[in-house]
């Protein structure tokens, strides 16, 4: 589920956690998520924190146990583009802050570029796709850069659209700081 306002929710029909190959996980009350989620340290040195979820496994068995699943921060839902590519354009929005920060993941051949547009959809000078070098990798806190740098001060507080052009990539979240 996800919500843009905390009041209205969208639920997807696809499984979030699949039962896996063990037959015992396909029956009543298995894969039931335990109450709450935790922010935990990654097992990889230097990697960002992650979200841990726990679910029941083998509920009716003598050796009933909890299984830990991990997600990247804000990794519940993403805008996805396959290798053929895709685009997403936001509705006009106003923001406070000086920089755009994205949480994303690409393949080695994938990328994301960001264009800042006026409210009618025209690229703002200095913030076009041509001004944004390809972004690739796997980060939860990457500041978007354009040729002139990362500052968005000149468009802050004004209605703008953000255009994301993506290839073999997932965009999990955006924020301004």
What residues fall within each predicted segment?
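Carbohydrate-active catalytic/glycan-binding domains of CAZyme proteins
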Residues: 1-177
